[in-house]
Amino acid sequence: MNDSVKTSLKRTLVGKVVSNKMDKTVTVLVEHRVKHPIYGKYVVRSKKYHAHDDANTYNEGDLVEIQETRPISKTKAWVVARLVEAARVI
């Protein structure tokens, strides 16, 4: 038998939680840098994703990793996989 470790083929992204006002849902802002095709300057592009947070544990400012999953609702097809870094409380 072959004892190989299964790896997840689902996409994962890292972003910042910008809203946790919905029940069991967080809004995650994912930013990435893209080089402008003509000018060559690096520009920051961003997109917001709704991710499933079953226990309502993540707060605004947390850095989280989200993973693609089956559609949970009309706008939600991602689930929070893990907490990368907690938000600083001042």
Swiss-Prot record:
Transmembrane segments: none
Cited HAMAP family: Ribosomal_uS17_B (MF_01345_B)
Family from the record: Belongs to the universal ribosomal protein uS17 family.
UniProt keyword terms in alphabetical order: Ribonucleoprotein, Ribosomal protein, RNA-binding, rRNA-binding
GO MF term list: rRNA binding; structural constituent of ribosome
Any single Pfam family the record assigns to this protein: Ribosomal_S17
Protein name: Small ribosomal subunit protein uS17
Function: One of the primary rRNA binding proteins, it binds specifically to the 5'-end of 16S ribosomal RNA.
The protein's assembly and partners: Part of the 30S ribosomal subunit.
GO CC aspect terms: cytosolic small ribosomal subunit
GO biological process: translation
